[in-house]
Amino acid sequence: KLFPGDMAQPRGLKAMRAILPAGTQVYAVGGAQPDNFADWIAASADGFGLGSAIYKPGDTPQSVKQKARAIVAAFDAAW
């Protein structure tokens, strides 16, 4: 888990890979979002942890559904 991802940025993950043991999985949490999935994947992120990108207090079930669908579509397009 790379948290907060928005502080490290994809370039930080690339630098960390030089010292991490081969095969170490890294998941960007906090800062990964649909518009930057491709950047994280290019930096070798193995996945993402998302919270407020999907749900914030007061969101309706419909808005959560729409956000989740948009996130899945962005992930599929980036991967």
Question: Language model features by range: what are they?
Answer:
Residues 23-27, 47:
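Structural preference for beta-strand elements that scaffold enzyme active sites
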Residues 73-79:
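Expand to "…catalyze enediolate/carbanion chemistry for C-C bond making/breaking, isomerization
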Residues 43-44:
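Structural motif
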Residues 30:
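Short loop/edge segments at beta-strand edges and connector loops
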Residues 2-21, 33-38, 57-70:
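Active-site-adjacent beta->alpha loops and helix N-cap segments on the catalytic face
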